[in-house]
A protein has these predicted regions:
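Short helix/strand-capping hinge loops at secondary-structure junctions
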Residues: 120-122, 127-128
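N-terminal glycine-/serine-/threonine-rich beta1-alpha1-beta2 phosphate-ribose binding loop
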Residues: 17-119, 141, 204, 224, ...
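Interdomain hinge/lid region at the active-site interface
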Residues: 239-277
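C-terminal helix-rich "cap/oligomerization" subdomain common to oxidoreductases
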Residues: 99-100, 272-309
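Rossmann-like dinucleotide-binding domain that binds NAD(P)(H)
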Residues: 172-240, 283-286, 290
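A contiguous active-site-proximal alpha/beta segment in oxidoreductase catalytic domains
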Residues: 129-184
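Sec-dependent N-terminal signal peptides
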Residues: 3-13
């Protein structure tokens, strides 16, 4: 009997130690996928250490991907996962230890980050970091010295990505789905996943970008310091994901998939909330935005090479 009591006490203590997370924006399927991984302790895919306990619904009235889904996902969080809903972002602050900004509309991110900073808690920002480079830089300025933040695509943690981070890479060709979104940065809608895959392998250091466009694809070629090159092929209407990594003496192909599961990403998100240290440096995340901004400028100039800075 004493063993049972001790075991129950141990389990209760472990559950009590879970970080409490609050969601901003319930207009993406990520809010359901992430909550299942965090809150379902009986699942073999369970990620321990944090739980979603509260949410602010949010939503964008002029974006179909938002207004067609925001209520549906909010209802599922409320009924299936007993997540408490609050009327505004400020009301999340006393209820949570960390904030997950999930709003599908990147145009909202800067203003929502500014409000979330009042909580003084770490902030996870789902892709894209922002809808423009200017907003991304404004997020960095606003958060500096106040709250740590982290943003990434799940493809950074896809199958075999870590295995090809060779020290002698000369170039990478990455490809995947490339439906285009709205300007100012149309790559932030979906092709950002391929850009993130490229950066996961290449690392930062891109200096110049050239972009060409056809009806069924965009090709963006970046020149890195030291003469390395990285290429993104954003394919429409859809594509699997992959990368060909060139190194001294040969090449290696990998096939990560965005549908492989979000568990590796969610594990990194929980570690971030625990340590308050982003696994992807903020400087690299901002360079991803600079890469897409330079690609947009190159496109507007008819494919002329554009410097990142």
């Amino acid at each position: 009997m004493r063993r049972l009591v001790a075991l129950l006490a141990c389990c209760t203590s472990a559950a009590a130690a879970d970080l409490r997370l609050g969601i901003i924006g319930t207009d993406t399927s990520h809010v359901i996928d992430f909550t299942k991984l965090l809150n379902d302790g009986s699942s073999p895919e369970h990620v321990p250490g944090a739980r979603v306990v509260a949410a602010f619904k949010g939503g964008s009235k002029d974006l179909p991907d938002s207004y067609k889904r925001v209520d549906k996902f909010a209802d599922e969080l409320r009924t299936s996962w007993k997540v408490e809903f609050v009327p505004d972002i400020r009301s999340l602050c006393p209820k949570v230890d960390g904030v997950m900004l999930e709003s599908v509309d990147g145009r909202q991110h800067l203003e929502q980050v500014k409000q979330a900073l009042a909580c003084g808690k770490p902030i996870w920002i789902d892709k894209p970091l922002a809808s423009s480079l200017e907003d991304a830089r404004a997020i960095e300025r606003a958060a500096k010295g106040r709250s740590p933040w982290f943003s990434a695509s799940s493809l950074r943690y896809g199958k075999d990505v870590d295995a090809v981070k060779f020290p002698n890479i000369s170039g990478v060709v990455a490809w995947g789905a490339g439906p285009l979104g709205r300007e100012p940065l149309d790559l932030t809608y979906y092709a950002i996943h391929v850009v993130e895959l490229l950066y996961a392998v290449m690392g930062p250091g891109c200096e110049e970008v050239t972009r060409t466009h056809t009806d069924n694809s965009d090709v963006i070629v970046g020149k890195w310091k030291g003469g390395r090159t990285g290429e993104v092929r954003a394919i429409r209407p859809d594509s699997d994901y992959g990368a060909l990594v060139f190194r001294d003496g040969g090449k290696v192909a990998i096939s990560p998939n965005i549908d492989d599961g979000y568990r590796p990403l969610v594990e990194e998100i929980v570690k971030f909330f625990q340590t308050k240290r982003p696994p992807v440096p903020n400087e690299e995340t901002l360079e991803v935005m600079e890469f897409m901004n330079a690609a947009q400028r190159s496109l507007s100039l008819g494919g002329t090479p554009v410097k990142l800075r």
